[in-house]
């Protein structure tokens, strides 16, 4: 196995591995060689988790120095902050000496947390109370590093770091980055790369470590050349545009023109605040070019014309004996040509020419250990250019240089210069992945690595961190390898393992990964939908793998699974079970069925393991009959197969039916849906029969039933108690049980008719009841019920539980039991009688009720949640995530659109949903279209498809003369996979039981040139048909023009969404969609196609616990404690995921907000700057999360005096918003309000008025005229108009504000009084102005005593206060008198037996909150509005809590 082999050889290859993995500062294969150095990463005692230290410390400070400016303010920084020069780069990550210590006492607090459940926050909080964050820090050690030709370097390191990390530091520093082949020596003793610093003898404070140049080997020489190439290309964005090596783009530095923290405060009169034309309100079609600003100057200076391996390689035998390793060929910028020899001592110029081989050294000879030194010696241009590249490289933020966890692709790219690059060519045609030629054992055994990491111990915190980090690292490498392999399979670069069979039935193995192209060739899915079922099966299987991995049952193994969509095909990549290819399928499977239920097997070990998993996943063990009518017990669906590998592990696969079916999309004879569902058009016959309910829905359904169960039981027990009491004293009974039972019959929800019958008083009463009060009432009812159970007659208590179980539909009569049988509606499956009370009829009803709950409860809940517009989806991706978080499948999108179409206040969401539906329908058509296209026509076919989709102009697809000349025969692998229905079948399952297949759309195959027959009209007719068939929704448009006019869709938004959905990269230029003379898109406009990759995301459980505990503290108003816990979560995330990850970004955003609320705007700016860069690189430049990060950063920039930068950031956020979804969105109103206010502060009143008018228009549309947003917009408009001298308009607008405040807040409220005072001043000014104007009109001349209008610009402080209000932050002033009042109130409410200490503790917490800033008039912060979290939150979409603090 690769892991074991590498473990044996790790010492021998330590230096080489460290240098190999560092050849690119942003290279993916940096973290300790695939499984982090084998020997160390699998040793639980090695504490190797520290080798990937925190780029961002717990207090949000980065290694690049912003936090060094902090002077211990608020003492939130628990570890010393070192200067920038002391930062350590480990595996490409900037290091801090902050590590996670192996402290057992603290680690054990989270030892039992395997899978945090939805209700896990209280437990997390309890754990968090016992966590000492100081224990997670480590002391630093200062050492000096002496390098040849460089000054002595002083570095502060952690004593738990590895020697290898010093290698990474030196390879990242400007002075030493060109060295790769060296060792580190202390007192003439060479240090082990994988030794911890604390284990090194004689290493003390101030010790000097010497860098010693080592002789080259062939491998080291190649590594060095690769590293030099990467240094020269460091500034080139080509790899990011091409989607190579996990590089990606960020433009924050371009927009801010440097680090925000290094900028000085700007005076308002020196700010250039004119917005670009495409940012001003009223833009209908935003341009594309600003998406990539300054793209022409992104590339650094060219240092060499050519650096490549020479054609004279490899050295002949005699030269090998002289020490020659390899030959290089270089062309300098001076146009001089050199042949260079690499030998064990270094590099020198030889006397070879293009025609003559003469390996002897040139005269005069110059030998350099570093190739950079040699090139600098022979080329002055190279020396100057390399110095410039290095300076610009080191000026970039550390986050810009680190590799992302997964590849992020761009949907638009400029024309890229294609240069000579031998290493790129070598990588492209190498059968291995990146650095695998440097790994002992060569090819990696992915399955062994994936399973071995899961078997690592997990009892203590260090063990769990090591385990999760190893899982994440191996998984990331596997995803990268699987993606590359899937693309190679489609491109025809991989030989099938069964080449003699029909191409549709071929299977592939590449790099120890199994690939299947899911054509349903053996009618495996014939009864389930054929190719359509085969296409979706891998996606459902991936869902199953995800949930079983999350449950994480010890001894139960799943396969590494990645699903790749590329060029219209779906490829499933899986790790290979040991021995699976050596046996027939029938011999391999020991559990489940290989023929959909005819032959069913069971296995006691599998039953034991799956029963444990089923408890978490709510899967009901059930008994089915096999073909011999023998009962067989299963704890999963019949399709789930169990195979015991040659390694003795118990594997499960084919998890496509982990969850129960969705009966709303199955036409079943014995199922009668409710009248409400029938009226809505259900059941809808889907094109396949694999539709399943989501796990989120089942959890919500069970939770809803559990609340009903408790309420009914409590009501009945109260009734029994009252009856007993009434026998002694005449008392009125409490409401009877029947009412509670009736209420539960509709899944715990009131019928719509019942809601409409409520009178206004009841509705107001219900609205006024807070969530906390309702929760408290339920808790009290439960407690009372429990006490009643203890005191009541046991028979009566059992009867109460029985009736409550019957009322909510529990499977068991005497116990609350909700589990689901995934096979309950499977065709051909015969069920035996279940356990007592779990009859098949009950199981079917339960599945039906869950599906009904989705339609009648979850869809209304989804829409109600978005009615407040507090977390508005911005594009189809965020809409899909929101639907999934409510357990709603995207196949219900048509029903959601029908409801939204009747709600004008949800117009923006309706438009986004329609756009997403059109994109998905078009994707189905595109996949089939692409499968019928020859490889040499791909560019022409894709551009023709885009013309048909986005334009109504001429679309004459002409095959270019170049392509016609190339055309011959069928031309490539692509056509071998044509399907009669555009799909792909299941291969490995049919022969090995190891794979699910996949399929695409549903049109008939045709000749390779049929794509030329498509027209805009025919495409939109297909889209309409697909929308009706798949989503049961009538798309009322037959062209792009009608879609734009009827639904308000922007063409550019549709193009972006479609390109991202199917993997198209178009040329970065402006497109004229209205062109009537020539097609909008040509062949040259299609730059590339990239894969769409679906995979599971490993979790960091301890970090999740820290995060949720921190959220709980924040909700209690304990900001400092919350800050510490969120910082701890960030530390743990950095240890598990590395520096860049989506969840790290969520932590950074929260830390920045907390810093701002705690009064430290500079710290907030430093942290938020990193959050923006991280979101751009990990999520994408135009991702909804990136827009959110930009708006936050603009606020913090303004608070730090960077007024101009704040405007630029808002302009960027607004441009991205309009590009993605247009101007008609509630979030645009927020951005426009911010822009208007800052322009107002700068005296640009006309521009300010344009933005605030647009914001007011949107706020009126989406919030109504009785909303705080609208009142605030009226007030801002009045302020602007008064400064322009338009007092009449200002007076009218301020009246609107005043009337709202008076009606909603009362006359005595502070806001009402402020508005009244504003009205008085405006009225006074208006009357004075009108009086003077009347005098002018009456006299006909200007009187000399007309006073000038004095317009006092607002102070920056008042503008900041208003910005805070707009963005949902309110600072409430609390005086000492208020604190005394609060003390008396608390004393009244405390119990009489409370001690004085308890009272004082309560007072002290308030005083501490008030003293956060050390001011006489102190402040408690209150976030009055949760910011929209458009992006994915920490750990599977968990919402970040609103940061609220109560002032009492």
UniProtKB/Swiss-Prot annotation:
Region (Disordered): 1-96, 110-129, 265-286, 726-773, 958-1010, 1414-1448
Domain Clu: 424-666
Compositional bias ranges of the Basic residues kind: 68-77, 966-981
Low complexity compositional bias, start-end: 9-26, 41-66, 986-1007
Phenotype caused by lack of the gene: Causes mitochondria to cluster within cells.
Ranges of Basic and acidic residues composition bias in the record: 748-769, 1419-1429
One GO CC term on file: cytosol
Residues the record lists as Phosphoserine modifications: 270
Top-level division of the source organism's lineage: Eukaryota
Protein family: Belongs to the CLU family.
Protein name according to UniProt: Protein clueless
Organism: Drosophila melanogaster
Organism placement in taxonomy: Eukaryota, Metazoa, Ecdysozoa, Arthropoda, Hexapoda
